[in-house]
Design a protein with these regions (language model features):
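Phosphate-handling DNA/RNA-contact segment within nucleic-acid enzymes
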Residues: 1-99, 112-114
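Replication-associated primase and helicase/ATPase modules
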Residues: 1-7, 17-24, 66, 95-103, ...
Length: 173
């Protein structure tokens, strides 16, 4: 039995569809329910279309939260998920950059996450920098711990030079 067949046979998964702006299926991701090896398996169906979970259902006239994982996006109103750390495709979405609030996982020691946050600040995006009192890694964990995630995000969203200064104090890499 191949490894992929073994993964699907032995581990239950939640299948989440990705649609494009026109409501056409562009891919799916399969999330492990037990959190074992290969937490996410993603299959892209159409080339040239960024995989953005929830893009087909956001209100483009309101602020849009951009998070890493599809599960995290379900805890916020008007949110999309990039699936992992592929935030580099935001400029291809046709969404108004000023309406986007980029919400990375709370990983101040992760060099890749730090690079991506720095890049998004340089590109002029609104970014969330989690307060040091938050120890949970992602929105899902924060909600389970009883945090008011919407308020924390509202109070810790920065852009421009303020974001740059806050980022310098936040990162640990």
């Amino acid at each position: 039995m191949t490894n992929i067949k073994k993964v699907f046979k032995e581990e239950p998964r939640l299948v989440l569809p990705f649609y494009d702006n026109d409501g056409q299926l562009s891919g799916v991701t399969c999330r492990a329910l037990r959190g074992e090896a290969l937490r996410y398996l993603t299959v892209k169906i159409r080339d040239g279309v960024p995989l953005l979970f929830g893009i087909d259902s956001v209100n483009k006239s309101k602020p849009i939260y951009v998070v890493q994982g599809p599960i995290d996006s379900l805890f916020l109103d008007n949110a999309i998920a990039v699936g992992g750390t592929s935030f580099g495709k935001l400029n291809e979405t046709g969404l108004d950059k000023d309406k986007l609030i980029v919400v990375f996982d709370n990983q101040p020691r992760n060099k890749e996450v730090c690079k991506l946050i720095d890049k998004n600040i340089e590109l002029g995006y609104n970014v969330v920098l989690w307060p040091q009192t938050i120890v949970e890694k992602d929105i899902n964990e924060m909600v389970m711990a009883g945090h008011n995630v919407k308020k924390i995000i509202k109070d810790n969203t920065y852009t421009g030079l303020t974001a740059k200064m806050k980022f310098i104090g936040w990162k640990r890499c």
